[in-house]
């Protein structure tokens, strides 16, 4: 029986750069009064979505989290939604 001695070369797919939703909207700094933008980063249950889901940079994720918390304190966003 004949053996195939050639090794398979693994081809890794090229990574596409993540789409940044804030950059696409032209937003540099996140504002807690911009409720429409903040709602895109909140789940149906009222939780802040993770970076992996939203595609934000670490700095932007911190800004969004702080803005959401401020908006909740100012009663612009609910703490939970039922």
From Swiss-Prot:
Pfam families named among the record's database cross-references: Ribosomal_S18
Residue span of region Disordered: 1-21
Any single GO CC term annotated in Swiss-Prot or TrEMBL for this entry: cytosolic small ribosomal subunit
Gene3D superfamilies per UniProt: Ribosomal protein S18
GO MF annotation: an example: structural constituent of ribosome
UniProt keyword list: Ribonucleoprotein, Ribosomal protein, RNA-binding, rRNA-binding
Gene Ontology biological process terms, A to Z: translation
Signal peptide region: none
InterPro entries: Ribosomal_bS18, Ribosomal_bS18_CS, Ribosomal_bS18_sf
Quaternary structure annotation from Swiss-Prot or TrEMBL: Part of the 30S ribosomal subunit. Forms a tight heterodimer with protein bS6.
Function: Binds as a heterodimer with protein bS6 to the central domain of the 16S rRNA, where it helps stabilize the platform of the 30S subunit.
Similarity-based family: Belongs to the bacterial ribosomal protein bS18 family.
NCBIfam families reported for this sequence: S18
The protein's name: Small ribosomal subunit protein bS18
Lineage: Bacteria, Bacillati, Actinomycetota, Actinomycetes, Mycobacteriales
């Amino acid at each position: 029986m004949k053996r195939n001695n050639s090794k398979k070369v693994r081809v890794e797919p090229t990574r596409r750069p993540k789409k940044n939703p804030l950059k696409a909207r032209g937003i540099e700094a996140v504002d807690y009064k911009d409720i429409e933008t903040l709602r895109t980063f909140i789940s149906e249950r009222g939780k802040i979505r993770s970076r992996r889901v939203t595609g934000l940079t670490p700095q932007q994720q911190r800004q969004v989290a702080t803005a959401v918390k401020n908006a909740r304190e100012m009663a612009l966003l609910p703490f939970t939604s039922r």
